């Protein structure tokens, strides 16, 4: 256990995130040595927030204790390793009125202290946010050269050379694609299908086993169509730039249900400005010829066939009820039916997977030659089975390193694919990232739009989250973003669909 004691609540979330990057296996608990009055009523950032008795409480069970004291324009940081009594201290001067600069200075000081004490560095430095390419994109939009952007990312965040080069390269490709999009007069549409054949061990997304909900799928589509009607009416004067049907696993729907849903979308919206219509077919065990034909005849331009790995033993461990041959056959079937923009998702850091296993997976993927490959770093959330039943998986190694990511990048390059979007998540194996690779002209527009947060995305369905991006930028060049979420529970979504629509009405009626 790691304990952090603050003399007042400030930047706890940032400190907590950085410590979890360095020490992912440790439980990080936050305490305050200030009076209860200074904490009461504040929106505290971390789950564990307790008061020390008198500011000098002993933490005998803690392996490490950090103390962070804010005094005027100075911050004192003290790090004690209880096992050997080693203590490291530092003090920095800040302009406390500039919160962004103060936060960055604190994180740099904390990072440098831990790096010196452990000899460990992080590939992304102090960056713990999920969208590191947004920073590189902002630098490019501000007219900074590659060298100036590199220096800024290195000095401000201590990111590694490899990650800086990756960010700059992706930001340039994103900008070229996004220049085609009318942010002010356009929007994108997400449709959520929350059903799955089964729940994977690593998954925390909102999903419901189809076997349990099979008799209510049409009720769900009835409610979804009602939300689609509202969206089409509200945005009739806007340009619809991209559509993404995700989940869950959309191909748990029957061919007739898929046809019903897509025809509803096509009848409700003007698609003349739509650059991309994606359906995440996803699980190979949910894909059939009839379902692919329903997608093809309705003009779907991009699909996913997601193996996650091509090692059967791993598929069995994580609860994927399909075989390696199922993946190959589903992919071949999609090609046979004329799909020319197919993505494949792979996950690094799965239980018991070695570098040779990854090489085997990439060899088989290379033989299939998909148009997109998305390399995910395993990020296990609290709601995932790998966490809830962690004792079952405690003896299994889950390793992801720069070597794994470099191997995948090399194979993608051999396939003629270039990195075009990137994002990170909390708790990623090896402190790595998710990277999307694509052939020329096959990049996923929706993926870039949702990461860069430059355009409103209207999301329909259980658990879907709508983001309204305001067109007028803030003084720092960022845009105000407001959100509303639909309830996750399928039964509640069906019963309360009118309330879900009212939430959207309130979000978009604000001036």
Language-model segments: residues:
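Radical SAM enzyme core and accessory elements
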Residues: 1-146, 224, 440-511
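Key residue(s) within conserved catalytic/signature motifs
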Residues: 11, 169-170, 202, 279
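A C-terminal junction/extension of Radical SAM enzymes
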Residues: 26-32, 46, 383-460
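Short beta-strand motif preference
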Residues: 77-79, 191, 305
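N-terminal [4Fe-4S]-dependent radical SAM core
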Residues: 118-121, 141-189
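Canonical Radical SAM [4Fe-4S] cluster-binding loop centered on the CxxxCxxC motif
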Residues: 184-219
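Beta-strand scaffold of nucleotide-dependent catalytic cores
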Residues: 192, 304, 373-377, 448, ...
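Conserved non-cysteine loop/helix-boundary elements of the Radical SAM core domain that shape
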Residues: 207-408
């Amino acid at each position: 256990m790691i304990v952090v004691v603050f003399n007042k609540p400030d930047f706890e979330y940032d400190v907590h995130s950085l410590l979890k990057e360095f020490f992912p296996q440790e439980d990080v608990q936050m305490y305050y040595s200030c009076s209860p009055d200074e904490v009461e009523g504040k929106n505290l950032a971390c789950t564990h927030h307790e008061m020390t008795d008198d500011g000098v409480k002993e933490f005998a069970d803690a392996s490490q204790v950090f103390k962070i004291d804010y005094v005027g324009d100075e911050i004192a940081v003290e790090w004690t390793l209880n096992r050997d009594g080693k203590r490291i201290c530092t003090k920095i001067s800040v302009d406390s009125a500039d919160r962004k600069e103060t936060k960055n200075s604190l994180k740099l000081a904390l990072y440098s202290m831990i790096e010196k004490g452990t000899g460990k560095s992080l590939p992304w430095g102090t960056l713990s946010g999920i969208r590191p390419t947004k920073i590189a994109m902002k630098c490019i939009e501000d007219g900074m050269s590659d060298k100036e952007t590199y220096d800024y990312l290195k000095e401000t965040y201590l990111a590694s050379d490899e990650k800086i080069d990756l960010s700059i390269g992706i930001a340039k490709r994103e900008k070229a694609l996004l220049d085609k999009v009318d942010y002010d007069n356009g929007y994108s549409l997400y449709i959520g299908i929350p059903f799955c054949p089964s729940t994977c061990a690593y998954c925390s997304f909102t999903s419901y086993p189809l076997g349990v909900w099979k008799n209510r799928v049409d009720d769900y589509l009835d409610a979804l169509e009602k939300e689609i009607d509202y969206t089409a009416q509200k945005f009739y004067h806007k340009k619809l730039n991209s559509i993404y049907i995700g989940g869950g696993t959309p191909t748990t729907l029957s061919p007739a249900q898929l046809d019903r849903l897509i025809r509803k979308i096509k009848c409700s919206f003007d698609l003349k400005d739509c650059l991309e219509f994606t359906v995440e077919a996803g699980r190979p065990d949910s894909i059939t010829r009839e379902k692919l034909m329903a997608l093809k005849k309705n003009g779907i331009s991009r699909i996913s066939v997601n193996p996650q790995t091509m090692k059967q033993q791993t598929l069995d461990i994580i609860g994927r009820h399909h075989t390696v041959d199922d993946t190959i056959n589903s992919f071949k079937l999609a090609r046979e039916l004329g799909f020319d923009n197919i993505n494949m998702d792979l996950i690094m850091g799965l239980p018991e997977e070695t570098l040779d296993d990854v090489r085997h997976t990439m060899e088989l993927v290379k033989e299939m030659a998909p148009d997109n490959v998305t390399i995910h770093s395993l990020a296990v959330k609290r709601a995932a089975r790998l966490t809830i039943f962690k004792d079952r998986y405690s003896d299994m190694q889950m390793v992801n390193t720069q070597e794994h990511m470099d191997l995948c990048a090399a194979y993608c390059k051999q396939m003629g694919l270039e990195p075009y979007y990137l994002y990170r998540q909390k708790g990623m194996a090896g402190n790595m990232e998710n990277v999307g690779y694509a052939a020329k002209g096959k990049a996923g527009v929706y993926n870039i739009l949702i990461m860069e947060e430059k355009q409103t995305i209207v999301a329909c369905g259980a658990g879907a989250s709508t983001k309204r991006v305001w067109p007028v930028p803030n003084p720092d060049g960022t845009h105000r973003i407001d959100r509303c979420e639909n309830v996750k529970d399928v039964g509640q979504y069906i019963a309360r669909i009118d309330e879900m629509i009212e939430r959207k009405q309130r979000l978009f009626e604000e001036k």
